[in-house]
Amino acid sequence: MSIREKLLMKKIVKREKMKKELSQKKGNKNAQKQEPPKQNGNKPSKKPEKLSKKHVAKDEDDDLEEDFQEAPLPKKKQQKQPPKKQQIQVANSDSESDDDEQEDEADEDSDLDEVAEVDEEDVDSGSEDDDQQEDEDEEEPVPAKKTKLLPNKSKAQNGKPAKDDEPFTVESSLAALDYRDSDDRSFASLKGAVSEATLRAIKEMGFTEMTEIQSKSLTPLLKGRDLVGAAQTGSGKTLAFLIPAVELINKLRFMPRNGTGVIIISPTRELSMQTFGVLKELMAHHHHTYGLVMGGSNRQVESEKLGKGINILVATPGRLLDHLQNSPDFLYKNLQCLIIDEVDRILEIGFEEELKQIINLLPKRRQTMLFSATQTARIEALSKLALKSEPIYVGVHDNQDTATVDGLEQGYIVCPSEKRLLVLFTFLKKNRKKKVMVFFSSCMSVKYHHELFNYIDLPVTSIHGKQKQTKRTTTFFQFCNAESGILLCTDVAARGLDIPQVDWIVQYDPPDDPREYIHRVGRTARGSGTSGHALLLMRPEELGFLRYLKAAKVPLNEFEFSWQKIADIQLQLEKLIAKNYFLNQSAKEAFKSYVRAYDSHQLKQIFNVNTLDLQAVAKSFGFLVPPVVDLKVGAAKRERPEKRVGGGGFGFYKKMNEGSASKQRHFKQVNRDQAKKFMR
């Protein structure tokens, strides 16, 4: 029997008892006066009623009389009182009473605790003494109905809350959690704080113990705190923010009609797909909706799915801003949590302006999480903009001696420019049965080496930013599922990607800075108890970079390499490039892009383009005479527009309009009406 029914039964018994006592008193008076008894018609006493501080609303009294019509209740004079302020909108007024009364009695008490920020006077504690209740002739206060954190459908139009409705807020139901680094790091210790459906999914994924970043961040995140997390690559940051996101949506009972409650921003398409894959496994036993939007996908299909309602959304920055500005059916006003993964990478690739616009468009009352492998001044500035409350900082490896994981064996070899390709070919030929990733500095360099190695019977695959999205996706999953293989890639694959069992990371072209080096080598030795190897090729003039790596806590040893065992294919390479027109054109573009990328290095005192021997560099691309490179053209192409607003190609046309007046005539933006007139 529920609390409400118990209170009603007490009320009925008390009133029947009062009626009997009243009839006995009248009978005694009639016997003394020897007058015939009068029919009182079951009228209640005219004793003035006392008005309780905690009153019952008129609509709830009507519900009580409908449920218990067989027990006649005395008519009471209702006194109008202003309704209590409530910060939560009740969902679906059409079925609010029927659905609530059919739920289990055991869930009644726990559900009352899960209601967020209801005024204290609206809920009766039920702890008043029975004697005090019998002495006072007043209505018993009925506990407030269970309310759901859903928009009021009767007061909303087109899925948008009415103006009079206050935005619903989140009060964590995990008040019993204490922020502490518990010795028990098993996921089973989260029982009671995390739903059974989530724990079952984690177990099916094969995880039993939490990593350090997970054990330190899960408790405050489950309590609704803002957090800035810094940990090494492969330390389990993805689950650290996905578990609280899923639990938040589950606690609030989000439905598709409520729109998007959690947004997760990732820097690249591959990382977005990987995060979405982990989320899919974690949501195996939940009924909430989840989706992925990213550049290269069909925007119209994404917009239609957003209109139907996606509770947890994984997105890249540019496409997310496009939907926020141009998809009218995208309901994000009920957003409860914003998660930004690999923040430093997002800022490095030029999406700082997009992030600021996204943060300004989203609701201010939300939980925010920022995760990255490194912390910089730009991240701190973004944290002040995105995090309104005092965030918790969790730096897992701040006090460690090394910035890379323990199972990683890393080193370098000093190689002159003309021998670089021969060393790489020999190394890949020897390790072709292992899983190897090779990093280049430009897309054209990846494209050329991919064509060259496959032409000379060394099977390799490639991922770079100029590929179509379908090709990138197919290659990524093929390499993930393969037991061995060679992947040539740019830094698009250097952040966050969890590719299993990578044996070697080869950095053919030097990274921009130590942070980029850390992210590249983080693709191997991921997880506890795993091992991996990393190799960095350096010119003799670049040895000063080791000082920066040492300052960044990156231990590097020089690897021994037998120069007598290098495959001497230089003559065959030069003949092939001279005869094959397509390889020749690809090699020219790769050479130019390599020199331009070298010129754009941040550490110019180490990577100085003036120290490059272009004749020796050209030999590594198969040329006897180096092609002409215009560094000014490269610099102009590397410039980004001052401000990317997202959608409509604004940044593209703004860049094209810079220059002569003739160009402005050709690339001037026009609206739809002007475009129609022009077409006529």
Curated annotation (Swiss-Prot):
What is catalysed by this protein?
ATP + H2O = ADP + phosphate + H(+)
Domain of life the protein comes from: Eukaryota
Q: Known Gene3D superfamilies for this protein?
A: P-loop containing nucleotide triphosphate hydrolases
**Positions annotated to bind ATP:** 231-238
Q: Where is the composition biased (Basic and acidic residues)?
A: 670-680
State where the protein is found: Nucleus, Nucleolus
Residue window of motif DEVD box = 341-344
Q: Name the major location.
A: nucleus
Q: Name one GO molecular function term.
A: ATP hydrolysis activity
The UniProt record lists the keyword Iron-sulfur: no
Query: Ranges for the Helicase ATP-binding domain?
Result: 218-393
InterPro entries membership: DDX18/Has1_DEADc (IPR044773), DEAD/DEAH_box_helicase_dom (IPR011545), Helicase_ATP-bd (IPR014001), Helicase_C-like (IPR001650), P-loop_NTPase (IPR027417), RNA_helicase_DEAD_Q_motif (IPR014014), SPB4-like_CTE (IPR025313)
The parts of the chain that form a coiled coil are none
Return the EC number: 3.6.4.13
Q: Where is the composition biased (Basic residues)?
A: 74-83
Provide the GO biological process annotations: maturation of LSU-rRNA from tricistronic rRNA transcript (SSU-rRNA, 5.8S rRNA, LSU-rRNA)
Q: Does the keyword NADP apply?
A: no
Recite the UniProt keywords alphabetically: ATP-binding, Helicase, Hydrolase, Nucleotide-binding, Nucleus, RNA-binding
The region called Disordered is annotated at: 1-168, 659-680
For this chain, the family text in UniProt reads: Belongs to the DEAD box helicase family. DDX18/HAS1 subfamily.
Function of the protein: Probable RNA-dependent helicase. Functions in cell growth and proliferation. May have a role in ribosome biogenesis and, consequently, in protein biosynthesis.
Query: Anything else of interest in the record?
Result: Mutation in the pit gene produce larvae that cannot grow beyond the first instar larval stage although they can live as long as 7-10 days. All the tissues are equally affected and the perfectly shaped larvae are indistinguishable from first instar wild-type animals. 'Pitchoune' means 'small' in Provence (Southern part of France).
- The molecule here is called Probable ATP-dependent RNA helicase pitchoune
